[in-house]
């Protein structure tokens, strides 16, 4: 499948075949591709993934997730989180193999960009999570899987349920598996002229 086909065929699947399973090794391969090839600001790779396989944990998440069936019925459920402090805790590790001069420049730039700027820190993890989510869903589509990005849930209760570390934030959930039934018709999209402006507003 080429990229444009994956983009056109991907839909937010609401109903999954609960009997369909994805072997753990295939889950791992899918995630490894997304982890390896998704871009992120300063290559900080802000994302942290919680893959929820346990049936009881899925049921608990569904209770605080507006009772959405994707949470329990999909073959793979990921709570996509991000480390707010990664700019400080991991930057030297991430850039350690770079040319020393480049490494020093990048580490200094990261520090200047993020330090004492909580809004920037949060904005960046959400941007990176969005890039990761779309990459993962397109890779899943290429493998013949359906997916659904989800944010209809109680973030505070999900955080309690998964024992979220204090320096992490929940970005969204992603359900992956085999859809069943026909998807709803696509809703209309904004016109090109309404969505796109050249040079200035």
Predicted segments with their positions:
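Acidic, surface-exposed loops and disordered segments
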Residues: 1-201
């Amino acid at each position: 499948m080429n990229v444009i086909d994956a983009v056109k065929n991907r839909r937010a699947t609401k109903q999954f075949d609960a009997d369909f399973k994805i072997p753990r090794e295939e889950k791992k391969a899918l995630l490894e591709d997304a982890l390896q090839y998704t871009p992120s600001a300063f290559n900080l790779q802000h994302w942290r993934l919680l893959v929820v396989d346990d049936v009881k944990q899925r049921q608990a998440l569904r209770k605080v997730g507006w009772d959405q069936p994707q949470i329990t019925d999909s073959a793979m459920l990921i709570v996509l989180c991000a480390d707010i402090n990664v700019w400080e805790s991991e930057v030297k590790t991430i850039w350690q193999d770079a040319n020393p001069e480049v490494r020093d420049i990048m580490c200094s730039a990261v520090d200047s960009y993020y330090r004492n700027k909580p809004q920037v820190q949060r904005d960046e993890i959400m941007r990176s999570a969005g890039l990761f989510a779309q990459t993962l869903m397109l890779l899943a589509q290429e493998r013949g899987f359906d997916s659904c990005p989800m944010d209809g849930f109680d973030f505070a209760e999900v955080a309690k349920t998964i024992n979220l570390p204090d320096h992490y934030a929940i970005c969204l959930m992603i359900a992956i598996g085999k859809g069943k039934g026909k998807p709803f018709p696509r809703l209309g999209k904004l016109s090109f002229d309404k969505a796109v402006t050249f040079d200035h507003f």
